From Swiss-Prot:
Keywords: Activator, DNA-binding, Nucleus, Transcription, Transcription regulation. GO terms for cellular component: CCAAT-binding factor complex; nucleus. Heterotrimeric transcription factor composed of three components, NF-YA, NF-YB and NF-YC. NF-YB and NF-YC must interact and dimerize for NF-YA association and DNA binding. It comes from Dictyostelium discoideum. It holds the Pfam family CBFD_NFYB_HMF. Stimulates the transcription of various genes by recognizing and binding to a CCAAT motif in promoters. Its main location: nucleus. This is Nuclear transcription factor Y subunit gamma. CDD domains: HFD_NFYC-like. Gene3D superfamilies: Histone, subunit A (1.10.20.10). Residues 163-176 have a biased composition (Basic residues). PANTHER family: HISTONE-LIKE TRANSCRIPTION FACTOR CCAAT-RELATED, NUCLEAR TRANSCRIPTION FACTOR Y SUBUNIT GAMMA.
Length: 684
């Protein structure tokens, strides 16, 4: 009675003798699970119908080699799906099998990612057993492991408790079965509205045999940086491109699936089957090929070509072109992981973003990080160029400042032209006041006058010119001075030089005045010449010394001329020397004197062109007396004496006095000329 009451409590709608006896036997057989029969299967189905339990049982059987794998059906048969509730969200995301009426099941479209596969319990009319485990024992995933191993409870109570346990827990209390397995994806559940009144799940119509996917078959990943079209680019443009590509691919796959289900005639194909069969036979291990195999390959090749064309055409439209090029195919395949098997065939050098894409980004004023980096690099380059230019200019200025103090205005004079003895060396360079005096040139002229006999011809004089170049270098002082300081120093030096020159001129003028005074005093003691045969009165004894002093003054004046000093008295001395030297011939020829006068006048004219301050009174009245005195007192009554100390003790007196009367020549007088008024006499 206890067993019958127990069975009535748990099986109210299916109380029969067969069920009670079977449950009683199962209760007393210590839970012997190997003795299941068809009656137990009926009891299980009755329990499911009474409790309206409509759930997809799942097995943890992973199709091991010990278990028999189910037959895969590719035929168009009536099947019912377990994802009718989520038909609005697209096809099932899980990797499920759906059993057909004949016991077969079909794969869904997406590949298997999880080892758990849901299946529906078939109808009781087929008398199909539930899936068995490796030992042949029925194993239910929804049953707790402890309930399967309990020996005190009966099979009916364990089955009923498992059914109630399913509604309460919904397989959340089985962590031991999922330790080493990946996470289970969310499977769809059937609603109450999808079941009939008998509790059996509703069958789908024949038109819903093939689910229509709403997402494309292969998706284009954008996770890997090497396969992105523009890494960290414009998100809006990238999203638009991705959505456009997904829409095209989804419509493509949906149309292809419709065409596949509608095809009934397999006689016409886009690709030649003979060519495909020939390619298949290129493998030596393949002996025979059925007629259906090339059809599958032909369709697969057709779909592959069409999908690649759709992907590449998006790139052609993006580049604003109407012709599909090889680069478009390469870029489209490199952006999708499903075509990684073709990665070795693609030239990686041609994978680059197009210019039109960058142009669109610039027109849309979308600033990407790459473009910002590019602008920063350009700014850095321009700044570096400006810095380099500034540094170069600074270095050049420094070098110029260092070189300018070291520059020396070396005015090396030209080699002087050797002139004849009759030419006057009147180098009064008054225009060279601004020249630097870093180079000082000293010229010393030594003039040797030979004693001439009365009948001897004049000999050429020998000139010796000595050039002593003295370079005054003060590099350590000048390098520390700036340009302005140098100019100031130069001006100061020039002023000092001018002052020195003025002092020298004043000294010379004083000397000349003294000399003229001495000569004027001596002239008063000279008597007038007479017609007698007596010679001229002797000159004072200091005249010889006076001649030597005149020669010394001439040498000093020549040295001062080369130092850019204004020595105008040098002309007189040089003229006197020339007259003295040329008039020692002791001849009665007046032409010699005239030639000397012409030479002297030419030289003096050249000097007058360069020296505007010379107050030269050139008496060209065939007179040898070129009194180019720079004194303001140009007296015609002055007498210039030039004495030549020689063995013959010949003296020359040049008289400019107009009242002087020339006397005829005597034996004692060497030569006389009224025009020149020069007298030669000897102290005999």
């Amino acid at each position: 009675m206890e067993n019958q009451i127990h069975s009535l409590l748990h099986f109210p709608s299916s109380a029969s003798t067969g069920s009670t006896s079977n449950s009683h036997n199962n209760h007393h057989n210590n839970n012997n699970n190997n003795n299941y029969n068809n009656n137990n299967n009926n009891n299980i189905n009755n329990i499911n119908n009474n409790h309206h339990h409509h759930h997809n049982y799942k097995s943890i059987q992973q199709h091991s080699p010990h278990s028999s794998t189910p037959n895969i059906s590719t035929e168009n048969v009536d099947i019912y799906s377990s994802h009718e509730a989520n038909s609005s969200n697209g096809y099932n995301n899980g990797n499920n099998f759906s059993y057909s009426m004949n016991g077969n099941f079909n794969y869904n479209f997406s590949p298997m990612n999880s080892p758990h596969h849901s299946h529906n319990h078939p109808d009781t009319s087929n008398n199909n057993m539930l899936p068995l485990n490796d030992s042949g024992i029925h194993f239910n995933q929804h049953q707790h492991p402890s309930s399967a191993s309990s020996s005190s409870s009966s099979s009916s109570s364990s089955l009923s408790s498992s059914s109630h346990h399913h509604h309460s827990n919904h397989h959340h209390h089985h962590p031991n079965l999922h330790i080493n397995l990946p996470p289970i994806p969310q499977y769809p559940s059937l609603n109450d509205s999808s079941s009939n009144g008998n509790g059996t799940p509703a069958l789908s119509s024949p038109s819903s045999t093939t689910p229509h996917p709403t997402t494309p078959h292969p998706t284009t990943p954008t996770s890997t940086p090497n396969q992105r079209f523009q890494s960290n680019g414009s998100s809006s443009f990238q999203n638009q491109l991705q959505n456009h590509l997904e829409n095209k691919l989804s419509s493509f796959w949906s149309s292809q699936l419709r065409d596949i289900h509608k095809t009934e005639d397999f006689k016409t194909h886009e690709l030649p089957l003979a060519r495909i069969k020939k390619i298949m036979k290129s493998d030596k291990d393949v002996n025979k090929i059925s007629s259906e195999a090339p059809i599958l390959f032909a369709k697969a090749c057709e779909i592959l070509i069409l999908e690649m064309t759709h992907r590449s055409w998006v790139h052609t439209e993006m580049n604003k072109r109407r012709t599909l090029q090889r680069t478009d195919i390469i870029n489209s395949l490199s952006r999708c992981e499903t075509f990684d098997f073709l990665i070795d065939m693609l030239p990686r050098d041609e994978i680059k973003p197009s210019r039109k894409y960058l142009d669109e980004l610039s027109k849309a004023q979308v600033i990407t990080p790459e473009y910002l980096q590019y602008l920063q690099l350009q700014q850095m380059a321009t700044e570096n160029q400006q810095k380099n230019n500034q540094n170069n200019q600074n270095n050049q200025n420094k070098n110029n400042q260092q070189i300018l103090p070291q520059q020396r205005n070396l005015n090396i004079p030209h080699s002087p032209q050797l002139q004849e003895q009759s030419s006057n060396n009147n180098n009064n360079n008054n225009n060279n006041n601004n020249n630097n005096n870093s180079v000082s040139v000293k010229r010393s002229y030594s003039m040797e006058i030979q004693n001439s006999s009365p009948l001897s011809t004049p000999k050429k004089r020998s000139n010796s010119q000595d050039y002593n170049f003295q370079y005054n270098e003060n590099n350590h002082n000048q390098s520390s001075l700036s340009q302005t300081q140098q100019l100031q120093q130069l001006n100061q030096q020039q002023q000092q030089q001018q002052q020195q020159q003025q002092q020298q001129q004043q000294q010379q003028q004083q000397q000349q005045q003294q000399h003229s005074q001495q000569i004027s005093q001596q002239i008063h003691h000279i008597p007038t010449p007479s017609n007698s045969s007596s010679s001229l009165p002797p000159l004072p004894p200091h005249n010889s010394n006076h001649a030597h002093n005149n020669n010394n003054n001439n040498n000093n004046n020549n040295n001062n001329n080369n130092n850019n000093n204004l020595n105008n008295n040098n002309n007189n001395n040089n003229n006197n020397n020339n007259n003295n030297n040329n008039n020692n011939n002791n001849n009665n020829n007046n032409n010699n004197n005239n030639n000397n006068n012409n030479n002297n006048n030419n030289n003096n004219n050249n000097n007058n062109n360069n020296n505007n301050n010379n107050n030269n009174n050139n008496n060209n009245n065939n007179n040898n007396n070129n009194n180019n005195n720079n004194n303001n007192n140009n007296n015609n009554n002055t007498f210039d004496y030039s004495f030549n100390d020689s063995k013959n003790d010949e003296h020359k007196v040049s008289l400019n006095e107009s009242n002087f009367i020339s006397t005829p020549t005597n034996d004692n007088i060497i030569s006389s000329s009224p025009s020149s008024q020069v007298y030669y006499y000897s102290d005999n």
